[in-house]
Amino acid sequence: MTTLVSALKEPQGLWMNGGAVAYATLGYILGFAGLFHESLVVNAASTLLLAHSMTIAAYLIHECGHNLVFKRSRHNAALGRAMSWLCGAAYGTYEDMRYKHFRHHVDNDDVVWFEYDEFFGKHPVLTRAVKFLEWFYIPAHDLIMHFIMVFTSFIIPQRRDQRRRNVTVILIRGGVFLLLLVYFPKVAVLYAIAYMLMMHVLRFMDMLQHDYPYNATLFEYKDPPHKGDAKWEQEHTFSNPVSLRYP
């Protein structure tokens, strides 16, 4: 226990971050197990628990990326990679997620690879389908982004060297989901609902954090126009207030 505490960024992290990790892990296990139950009430509660535990796992990746859990980067990376398996973000690498996120902070920009405005402009039928599905709270836009992440080494040329790893993760996660779909279709559907609930929470919160315009410069670095511009950052950053009294 002493060794673990000494490895943490802050002593209270044992209970704060440790509690979050325990909740995400146990919540995922219990939530997933509850999807197999015969009771619809248990199914509904388990779906919500699973969605919430995956959401916490996703935010823990963010904390690990900023090295806020452990003192050493390699320990944060190990935890971040583990959490990426819980929230379905393991198709790409932890290092890629961290690099993209820090480009966002350093450049004061939304740095991306996929020109989605241009893509939707060229595919009006798909755009109408996405809008239709979004009306029913199916996060179709994010599912397209997730599809790109799942097949990242096949779609993004700069990630072709990750092909073996990418295929391995697809076979493991895709294989398990296919088995669920064939033998336990109810579980597969409820898992998909839980995953989409997580997507809704993450994108709603992200929407409130920043409203930077995006630039497709993830792999083609160009001098960001607002790097170091504190005024620009403040104009496009919205922190969550703790309360109206203590913003």
Language-model regions, residue ranges each:
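Cytosolic-biased juxtamembrane loops and peripheral soluble domains of multi-pass membrane proteins
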Residues: 62-78, 100-126, 149-161, 204-245
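Aromatic-lined glycan-binding groove of carbohydrate-active enzymes
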Residues: 187, 191-215
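Non-catalytic, topology-defining segments of multipass membrane proteins
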Residues: 1-53, 60, 87-192
